[in-house]
Amino acid sequence: MSSRHPYAGLTPDVILAAVEGVGLACDGRLLALGSYENRVYQLGVEDQGFVVAKFYRPGRWSDAAIEEEHAFVAELVAAEIPAVAPLAFAGRTLNEYGGYRFALYPRQGGRPPEFDDPATLEWMGRLLGRIHAIGRRSVYQARPTLDIVAFGRKPRDYLLESNLLPPDLEPAWRAIADQALDAVRRSFDLAGDVRHLRLHGDCHAGNVLWTEEVPDEKHASPPQVFLGPPGGRRSAAAASGGPHFVDFDDSRMGPAVQDMWMLFSGDADAMARQRQRFLDGYEQFMDFDRRELRLIEALRTLRLLHYSAWIARRWDDPAFPAAFPWFNSQRYWQDCILELREQVGLMQEG
């Protein structure tokens, strides 16, 4: 397995052998699903529908960090919160084959949520309030915290050292990145010492699947959905309609508002209305410190910097140039400079 191309050895034969190694009989059906950081596949299981296999990027997370994520999702499922948890085989959710670590999940269907519907926003608020009420019960030991260093300073430094910035744009990008990070720091200072808890971490519409409510238990699971080994805990996601959370791979410690701001869109007035409807549901289960609202544009800025550095760090993975061909273009970095300037203005207004 090459460190530069970490998935070069992850062939279909290896994938099938890995899944069969935990005791499942694959029927040969194999479909790659959209994922770049990890590799995710849907596999057919004889007489049991489908299972989803996530192969973790080598070197990103320690075993302890992955197991903490799995344990958090298991807490949510135990509280009947609709989250898709990894399946356990022989008491373990993290498996290894041929140098690759992987987890298996039941397949969860659904459509994107309609966040322009006030009732949907309130429902999402109630669900995230329940998730955060569980998340605050303990802290991660092996997973990182969302902070300015990890999501801002380090990405800024990496990009400047990467030689991917066009030389003629580097001075302008460096200057506005530094201004943006100064504004982020001021926003965090103004917000004060807000509480950190275990988060989903990447809470946007792509990681929420909406299913229709079902009239009774016997219709709760669509056909061809693998629900796990005999005797295993059934995912709450398999038994109810509404929103279901998937992909806790970016879960970390951070302020509650990190799991909220990506759900809102439109102009400032529209987002304020959406936010209030969301909080109407959220605060039925969890209190919310309004000081965290000062962090929204700061967190958006950190996400912009982190996103560019994420692609840069993965540029040697052949999947990334194919998926993001515009990344090393002049136009991309010009747009980044303009976005950061806009963010500086928004943070100064706030």
Descriptions of predicted regions:
Residues E37-A53, P86, D182-M260:
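Active-site acidic catalytic loop and adjacent metal/ATP-binding pocket
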Residues E114-A172, V194-H196, A323-F324:
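A cross-family kinase active-site recognition segment
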Residues A236, A256-D287, R303-A319:
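Active-site activation/catalytic loop segments of kinase-like enzymes and analogous catalytic loops
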Residues M1-C26:
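Juxta-kinase regulatory segment immediately upstream of eukaryotic protein kinase catalytic domains
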Residues V22-G44:
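ATP-binding glycine-rich phosphate-binding loop
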